Design a protein with these regions (language model features):
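Short, glycine/charge-rich flexible loops or terminal/linker lids adjacent to PRPP-binding catalytic cores
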Residues: 1-46, 56-61
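PRPP-dependent phosphoribosyltransferase catalytic core
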Residues: 2-14, 64-182
Length: 182
């Protein structure tokens, strides 16, 4: 009852050549330092919540901002916690708890970022696209090489094909439903 909730809107943004990326504020939201200062302004204990904590790209970006603003993190709660994520929280000094613990997870995939026309990671552009469109990339073949290091060529091809087929099936189901309604 005596709590405040505030979402931190982050986005993984690739450079135009896809060589590197950074964690930034989601388009049309306040810059990350401002979002963290907003949380600090409530002067309440902070509990960070996410669906999964593995390599901690986002929390690595947020940790220095939380420290700069003297925003204490009382707890990190996640659905899935991996051994790598647990070790990172230990390094940062954040208490962490998860519903499921996956100590030896080597790779993870976020399906929504792999499906063309459904999701993806943002690609930096100097000009904005019309209609609120976001330039994005799906890290699958043929758009870009998958960024998963221990994956051989055949496995990358099979993963890419699976993502393309799933995206097609989802879009066909949506089209069928739309045509049935209209």
């Amino acid at each position: 009852p005596n709590t405040v909730t505030k979402t931190l809107r982050t986005d993984k943004v690739y450079e135009a050549d896809l060589s590197t990326y950074s964690i930034e504020a989601y388009p049309d939201y306040s810059p990350l330092p401002d979002q963290v200062r907003t949380i600090r302004a409530f002067d309440r204990p902070v509990i960070l919540v996410d669906d999964m904590l593995h390599d901690g790209k986002r929390i690595r970006r947020l940790a220095p901002l939380l420290e700069e603003t003297h925003t204490p993190v009382d707890q990190v709660l996640v659905g899935y916690l991996t051994g790598v994520g647990r070790d990172l929280m230990e390094q940062l000094g954040y208490p962490v708890d998860g519903i499921y613990y996956l100590p030896n997870l080597r790779m993870r995939f976020v399906e929504s970022t792999l499906y063309p026309f459904i999701g993806g990671d943002t690609v930096r552009r100097t000009e904005r696209l019309p209609g609120g469109l976001q330039p994005s990339v799906n890290r699958i073949l043929p758009y870009a090489a998958p960024e998963f290091a221990p994956m051989d060529g055949r496995t990358a091809w099979e993963l890419s094909l699976c993502c393309l087929e799933n995206a097609r099936d989802i879009l066909l189901a949506l089209e069928t439903e739309f045509r049935g309604l209209y």
